[in-house]
Amino acid sequence: MTTAETSYSEADITVLEGLEAVRKRPGMYIGSTGPTGLHHLVWEVVDNSVDEAMAGYCTTIEVILCEDGSCQVSDDGRGIPVGVHHQYEELTAAEVVLTVLHAGGKFGGEGYKVSGGLHGVGISVVNALSSRVEVEIDRDGSRYYMDFVDGGRLNTRLATSGASPDGRTGTTVRFWPDGSIFDETRFRFQTLSERFQMMAFLNRGLQIRLRDERSDGNHDEVEYQYEGGIRDFVAHVNSSKESLFAQVGYIEGIEEGQEVEVAFQWNTGFNADGLHSFANGINTLEGGMHEEGFRSALTAVVNRYAKKRNLIKDNDENLQGEDIREGLTAIISVRLSEPQFEGQTKSKLGNVEMRSLVQRTTNERLADWLEEHPQEAKAIVQKAVNAQRARVAAQDARRSARRKSALDG
């Protein structure tokens, strides 16, 4: 046995120890071994492709549920790098990405200024929890192939298999979830479809296709692509409601590589919880700094406009946030290089600077939008005034009922 072979073997054992930890405690990395964890494998692979799209290099992602129970994800991005990795001289960069935890362009490198990923653990976790993984890379005019078995053991080392067809670039990953790890290994088409639609809304112009080729499936096929981005998202959410006005409003701001975009439209309903926020494509269900910035600026801007246009009197009580948000459907999407999420589920954004950016953008751009759309602005204020009256009347009725019960008692 040569020294090079010995060195490679030792390095490989170290790498496999990392993946073995994932197999022993999968819940720590993907949340569970039930349906949520199973589908997390797909998200982890697709998120890599979406990162390529956010960086401006990928326009199409195709996901196929194959007849043999595997899932195949293809994109037309740059392709995973195939050169020797600077830290692991025995392995190519592509092999490192598939076998080392937290390896990849999004971890401290220059590959991506902005990236998502629910837990950011990387595609190596998919490898660890699969019985087989096949990877095909088109890059620099050549097609490369490698595969892994039994939870990440390198079976076929990365090697060129010919020229890339038509000069194609991109990555294709096909994986078979390990039945000894997961409670079930059948993917749910509807679960995938709903999430891919959301991803397409959040990445304007990105085409995402999903196809079911399983013999026991319905052979469904869907394709999502939205040139209007989050504007189309708001229109979709409001499609079953009666809109207060036809147009979906839109504002955006960019500062030092940080981006915010907001789409909004009011409807005639009474819900005040129609605000949905995202950070780097991740649904921040518990809100965070970006939502705080929008809420405070929205309240201030609408009150300023209403008083300036004499839609409410100077000595009248200000409209409260809940009055203004009644019937509002809004999508806030921010992109930032180093998001700070509270909790492993990434459900709340903690970056204070994002509150300032969203607040400034909303203060300036929403004020301009209201001035440019006086009819819509008047309808927004009138709805908020009606909500305020209903709120005050309800408070008065509660006070009156309490006084009456106190006297009766």
Language model: regions and residue ranges:
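Short, flexible helix-adjacent loops and helix caps
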Residues: 27, 34, 54, 82-85, ...
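Short conserved segment of the HATPase_c
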Residues: 82-104
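Residue-level signature of the cytosolic catalytic core of signaling kinases
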Residues: 11, 34, 86-90, 226
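GHKL-family ATPase ATP-binding module
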Residues: 1-11, 19, 43, 51-53, ...
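NAD(P)H-binding Rossmann-fold N-terminus in SDR/SDR-like oxidoreductases
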Residues: 79
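Conserved short strand/loop->alpha-helix "switch" segment adjacent to the catalytic nucleotide/phosphoryl-transfer site
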Residues: 24-43
